Every structure is written in structure tokens, then in C-alpha cells.
Amino acid sequence: MIPQISQAPGVVQLVLNFLQELEQQGFTGDTATSYADRLTMSTDNSIYQLLPDAVVFPRSTADVALIARLAAQERYSSLIFTPRGGGTGTKGQALNQGIIVDMSRHMNRIIEINPEEGWVRVEAGVIKDQLNQYLKPFGYFFAPELSTSNRATLGGMINTDASGQGSLVYGKTSDHVLGVR
């Protein structure tokens, strides 16, 4: 049984300072600190529940790089950051009590396909079933088959090296990734 989260704690000032500086430096994504927004990110497909202090939704790799650059500064060294895709992991990997970096809201584009060489370039928030629907006319698909493939993102699959039905034949996620940026 999942224990209930008690009173909604306020957001700590250091997190608010980070978010303010993030926006001042040109962050184009969204930020969220309301209890409702934080509560939606407090669970995944596991039995765990952790209420984050804030959620950021980058729109581009430049936004992700800005988050990383700012987080690396000494004054923010105590903050914890966790990337999140579809929240389909079963071991709590997408949860923390710091800042969630949600890749699924905006960074969900299929950028390029090269059918001759057999590769596709996508953003981390692309959902596996959507990718396979896109690839089908080219005679390709992205393995492995997951029970959560209608909401699992490629970034999350890479993070957990997802495997599932057909993995013995087609391999796990890392067997199909040429590179990440």
C-alpha cells in the first residue's frame, strides 16, 4: 500500500532561486511548483511516492544544456535532478524530492530518418508506439516490445535499458541505440 503524502510542503527557496535564474538565462520551457503539478510527478509505475520540489519541462537540447550548466554551479550543488520520461519504470527511477526534468511534454519529436542506413533521430520524449507507427511504412520497428509501449518514452527506455517480450530475438534497448546527445 502506498503511504499518503502528508501536508504539501512548500518549495524551498534554493529551488525557487534556481528556477528564477533558469528563466533569466533564457530557458524557453515550462516550470511548475504548484502542489498539483508536483503531485502528478510524485509517482511512477512503482510502489514508491516522492513529492518533488519542482518540475521543469525543457523545449530543446539548449534548455537541457542550460539546466545542466546552472545545476553544476556551486551554489546549486545540493539540488537533486532526475530526468523523467513516461513514468513507466517499476523501480522508482523517475522519482526524487528535488527537481524533475520532464522530457515528455515538449521534447517528443521525431527529427530525422535515414531508411537507407536504417536509423532514426528522435528526442528523448518520443513514445515507443508513436515511433513504431512512424517507422512502419519504412519496414522498421524499434524493439523490444513493452507492456507500457503506449506511454514509455525512448529516453526512459535508454535510461533503464528496457527489455521485454522479444528481447531474446531482437535484443534490449541498448542493442538498438547508436548514440545519445
Language-model-detected regions and their locations in the chain:
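Short, basic and Ser/Thr-rich N-terminal targeting/leader segments
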Residues: 77, 84-86, 152, 176
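ATP-grasp fold ATP-binding core
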Residues: 81-83, 144
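Short glycine/serine/threonine/alanine-rich loop segments
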Residues: 76-79, 140
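FAD-binding subdomain of flavoenzyme oxidoreductases
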Residues: 110-113, 122-181
